[in-house]
Design a protein with these regions (language model features):
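Carbohydrate-associated surface elements
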Residues: 167, 188
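N-terminal subdomain of nucleotide-sugar transferases
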Residues: 1-64, 249
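Short His-centered aromatic/hydrophobic patch
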Residues: 105-110, 129
Length: 416
């Protein structure tokens, strides 16, 4: 495997900040805050985002964003494909002309512009692998061939490869990644933002809906006698939504609860027409609204399962919920065990609606004392082991290493 070229570190003046180019095929915020979270926590560096197209509706996002092909998000497939093809070279040239000290690509898919810019400028290239982009064979046809081409380019051109879980690092190794350049880098969540309700201990659910949130009240969030089982994510079979609705429906008569599904996806239309009365579909929500639901939930259920050759690599929503003091019920699959507090949440090895229903039943039967203890353990574990703070420290060390600092970065995959 050819070694990527790395530009020799150049002396940094006191006034000049290290420039980091964040690159990604497309950028949608919400929900993909992960691509920007580390930048917001490292203001000592100069950041610029380069993408084919972006759709950012959150006003708190202030990083400069360069779009090479805005039409790449067109709903019309021919227009979208044409814009993507035109935008690849434009994106590469834009990154190169900015003269970054480090290029950080999120997802190996659509990595060709970043790989090309790193080759042109000599800047070190960091590639974070997030899931399906690391698999050696996934899907068929032209799309699969395109993904494979990008994956090979990223594996060969990256100075450092970062996998979001140990599970995904193993997938990448089987796909041909160089163990010497591959590290596990957990993305982490902001435990100062994802918190239990102010003034309440983890595990204590508020009884009142904040003023102005009439939709929450109308959907039953202010009924403390009816516990909420919460799901947040894409409404798809990969996320196990079909199993969750089945398990919840078989349980609700003997263990009353409300199942709240936050998000959108391919299963949404059928769920809207056929979901039982105790199931609420909210659609996509802003982060603040997601946090409100988490603070009211008894548990978060995220039964992701193997689908079409892939498994969930990490699942930041698991960390967000636990940081809010909400234990998790999930299948033991992919990187999920790495995202749950040991002994505080429930993971079932049997991936069936019956097993899931039993786990949800057990969680809803916890006493107030046990629930509070588990909630506190969940939050403490996320804060100590999976916080954004710790993740930023690791990534800062990687950047410093690549630009000449003696600080060490993440552990190599071969050492774990």
């Amino acid at each position: 495997m050819p070694s990527p070229r790395v530009r020799a570190a150049r002396p940094q003046s006191r006034r000049r900040r290290v420039k980091v180019a964040l690159t990604k095929g497309t950028l949608l915020v919400p929900p993909t805050y992960f691509a920007l979270a580390h930048a917001g926590a490292m203001p000592e560096r100069e950041w610029r985002v380069f993408t084919l197209a972006a759709r950012v509706s959150d006003p708190s996002v202030t990083l400069p964003i360069h779009e090479a092909a805005p039409g790449a998000l067109s709903p019309a497939l021919p227009l979208r494909v044409a814009a993507q093809a035109r935008g690849l070279g434009a994106m590469r040239r834009a990154v190169s002309s900015w003269g970054p000290d480090v290029i950080h690509q999120h997802q190996a898919t659509w990595s060709l512009p970043a790989v090309g810019a790193a080759r042109e400028t000599g800047a070190p290239l960091v590639v974070t692998l997030h899931g399906g982009d690391a698999y050696p064979r996934l899907g068929r046809g032209l799309g699969a061939a395109w993904n494979a081409r990008n994956r090979r380019a990223a594996f060969e051109g990256a100075t450092r490869l970062l996998a979001v879980s140990r599970y995904l690092a193993d997938v990448a190794l089987r796909a041909g990644a160089d163990a010497a350049r591959l590290s596990v880098h957990y993305q982490g969540v902001d435990t100062q933002w994802w918190t239990p309700s102010p003034g309440l201990s983890p595990g204590t659910r508020p009884n009142l809906v904040p003023q102005g949130n009439h939709d929450l009240a109308a959907e039953g969030a202010d009924s403390p006698e009816v516990p909420i089982v919460l799901f947040v994510g894409t409404l798809s079979r990969l996320k196990g939504v079909d199993d969750l609705v089945c398990a919840s429906s078989s349980l609700v008569e003997r263990r009353p609860h409300r199942l709240v599904l936050v998000g959108d996806g391919p299963l949404a239309p059928s769920l809207r027409t056929s979901a039982p009365a105790h199931v609420t579909l909210t659609g996509p929500l802003a982060r603040e609204r997601v946090r409100e639901w988490m603070r009211r939930a008894r548990i978060l259920a995220l039964p992701t399962k193997p689908t079409q050759g892939r498994q969930e690599a990490a699942g930041l929503v698991l960390l967000e919920a636990q940081a809010c003091g909400v234990p998790v019920v999930a299948y033991r699959t992919g990187g999920t065990p790495e995202m749950t507090a040991p002994g505080a949440s429930l993971l079932t090895g049997e991936r069936t609606p019956d097993a899931l229903g039993c786990a949800i039943d057990e969680a809803l039967a916890w006493s107030e004392e046990e629930r509070a203890d588990r909630a506190a353990a969940c939050r403490a574990w996320v804060d100590a082991e999976r916080s954004l703070r710790g993740s930023v420290d690791q990534l800062r060390a990687v950047y410093d290493e690549l630009t000449g600092s003696p600080l060490r970065g993440c552990r190599a995959a071969s050492d774990e």
